[in-house]
């Protein structure tokens, strides 16, 4: 059914709740950065070498078996 001039049209618009918005833009990036930071603390040696127009990153990790779970699963001590 097409709307004619003068008709009142009600359209449902999906509304993102504020908490979802805040989580998406603030909490998730913070968690990712924290995970990266916790992983970077294990780095012993970090080398960036230019190869053409691409930078090759080599990182030597200092990881023991009990530490590996902390890096990937973010367990606290």
UniProtKB/Swiss-Prot annotation:
Keywords, comma-separated and alphabetical: Membrane, Transmembrane, Transmembrane helix
Entry's Gene Ontology cellular component terms: membrane
Subcellular location: Membrane
Entry superkingdom: Eukaryota
Bilayer topology annotation: Single-pass membrane protein
Main subcellular location: membrane
Membrane-spanning intervals of the chain: 13-33
Protein name per UniProt: Uncharacterized protein YHR213W-A
Organism (species): Saccharomyces cerevisiae (strain ATCC 204508 / S288c) (Baker's yeast)
């Amino acid at each position: 059914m097409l709307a004619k001039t003068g008709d009142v049209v009600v359209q449902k618009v999906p509304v993102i709740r504020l908490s979802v918005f805040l989580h998406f833009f603030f909490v998730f990036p913070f968690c990712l950065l924290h995970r990266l930071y916790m992983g970077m603390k294990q780095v012993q040696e970090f080398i960036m070498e230019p190869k053409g127009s691409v930078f090759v990153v080599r990182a030597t990790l200092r990881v023991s078996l009990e530490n590996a779970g902390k890096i990937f699963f973010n367990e606290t001590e």
